[in-house]
């Protein structure tokens, strides 16, 4: 269980930090502005994506509802796949479009470890609930 927690926190920290940094770069870097033009995206999309990345990074590290967390993972997966497709479509070299796919793997590792933590937490709460029921059942039966 400790190994899963460490894996989850490290991988999730990497994703959250990378998304926060890239959002900052999207908002401040002229080089990133030029890259979005190169990819054929309008300027406002860069800003929307930066805001979405900041919100998503917060949702990954904050204690939010499981559905919110899962939608955040789905959104980031779409971002990484779309980034790879955009770079491939514009003829960028493999070194450019491989990076989002590597982060997709890191995201997948974070998601799998998150699911394992959720299932172990669920099992613990059911075991505690189950023992409470049996004690109640025993007291009623007596």
At which residue positions do the language-model features occur?
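Membrane-interface extramembranous regions
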Residues: 1-142
């Amino acid at each position: 269980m400790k190994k899963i927690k460490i894996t989850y926190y490290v991988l999730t920290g990497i994703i959250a930090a990378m998304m926060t940094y890239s959002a900052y770069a999207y908002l401040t870097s002229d080089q990133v502005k030029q890259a979005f033009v190169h990819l054929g995206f309008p300027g406002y999309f860069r800003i929307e994506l930066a805001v979405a990345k900041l919100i998503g990074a917060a949702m990954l590290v904050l204690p939010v509802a499981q559905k919110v967390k899962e939608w955040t993972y789905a959104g980031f997966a779409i971002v990484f796949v779309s980034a790879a497709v955009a770079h491939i479509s514009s003829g960028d070299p493999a070194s450019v479009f491989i990076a989002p796919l590597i982060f997709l793997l890191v995201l997948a590792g974070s998601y799998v470890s998150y699911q394992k933590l959720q299932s172990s937490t669920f099992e613990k709460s059911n075991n505690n609930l189950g023992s409470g029921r049996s004690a109640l059942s025993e007291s009623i039966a007596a």
